[in-house]
Amino acid sequence: GLMTIWRLEPQFGLRQTLWLAVSGGVFALGLRLPDPLRLLRRYKYLWLTSGLLLTALTFFIGVYPSGVGPELWLGCCGVYLQPSEPLKLLLVVYLSAYLADALWLKFNWVSLLSPTLVLTGAALALLLAQRDLGTALIFLTLYFLILYLASGRARVMAAAVGVVLAAAVLGSLLFEVIQTRMAAWLNPWADPSGRSFQIVQSIMAVAAGSLMGSGPGLGSPGLVPVAHSDFIFAAIAEEMGLAGSLGLLAVVGLFVSRGLRAALHAPSNYQRYLAAGLSAYIGVQSILIIGGNLRALPLTGVTLPYVSYGGSSLLTSFIILLILILISSPAELEPAPLPKPAPYRLLALGMVGALTVLALGAGWWALVRAAPLSTRADNPRQAILDRFVGRGRLLDRAGLVLVADVGSPGSFRRQTNVPSLSRVTGYAHPLYGLSGLEAALNP
């Protein structure tokens, strides 16, 4: 991820490198603290309330680091923090600690859920007011997932499906951005240069990567808007190919599987819920943004953990890694009893299923649809390549040159020597694409 950011946006690469150093320092410091997991559990209300207050502050002193845009960051002395990123982590900490402490209620639903609904509802209200809809969706998903893991009751997941569907319908009625993203997702080819521009360019980048990619630094992922952040998966797919895409998906799957393994062997319910919730957090967010890049899901605008540009996201992801390592370290302790393992198995199967679908989607664009996408008139990659690598000559049977390259590498253009045969030879134009023999003989 860092290499791709440096390659696309060097100034952001420098910032991300500094954030990586800070995140590594926080990680090392956390390993030396006496018992950070106990501190997180003991002050669960304080942590979540602090996160809510920081998020609320963005309504008054929020900024957008790149100039004009959604003011979701808090800034000071050139350092910017997006509070909604650690807020997701703090929600998982709060729910895990609260549910572990409230087991004695034996799931009297009114008594159990009231505090969680108040705090989670407050967080959702803030995120919706900010139009940070991708984070709001993750919040809602994590809330029901952790509740399902703690209760083991299928009705929780049934309620989750109903709530998410209702939220999607209501959101599409209230928020124009959701309507636009849904339309772009369902039929991107209707407006490929307008509202669907991002997703169309993203899948073109994946298609351009084919099986092995163009090579580091040799593709054109910069054609995809915000390729260093929201669409970094497409950028990696173009230069590393389907092989790199599958490798990245495999790493996400390995991370989630190791996190769930730590959850199953955790010595307490609190640590079990925490490990499973944080693993689900990384998995769900990765699936959402990769799915958006591949048109498997509507765009959400969240980051790809550990990969996309974003200091707040990187720092939060390193803290998640720290917590998972702390939970998995004490191997000498006996795992806490697990009367209902089915929810954890279903969570693992769901993650595997989703990642498999994404792998098939990447293969579909990179292999099956690569040829037609590469020759589309709105795909500028062929035109860029033709400027640097000559297309060669078209000759008749007598050896007469009909069409040839003129110019030098970087400024090659096609010249037709026999205009009367242009209907046959066709054209290779940066705006209108390929036709005639230029299209039929395209390498």
Segments predicted by a language model, with ranges:
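Loop-to-helix entry and N-terminal half of a specific, functionally important transmembrane alpha helix
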Residues: A262-G301, V307
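Hydrophobic alpha-helical segments of polytopic membrane proteins
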Residues: G25, V110-L128, L133-L173
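Hydrophobic alpha-helical transmembrane segments
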Residues: A21-S23, E238-S257
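Membrane-interfacial entry segments at the cytosolic side of transmembrane helices
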Residues: L39-K44, W109-S114, S151-G162, P337-L349
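Alpha-helical transmembrane segments of multi-pass membrane proteins
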Residues: L54, T58, V93-A97, A123, ...
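Membrane-helix boundary/helix-loop-helix interface segments in multi-pass membrane proteins
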Residues: L2-R131, I290-P305, Y309, S313-F318, ...
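Periplasmic/cell-envelope proteins involved in peptidoglycan metabolism and beta-lactam response
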Residues: S328-P443
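Hydrophobic, glycine- and aromatic-enriched re-entrant/interface helices and adjoining loop segments
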Residues: P65-W73, C77-Y80, V156-L248, A266-L274
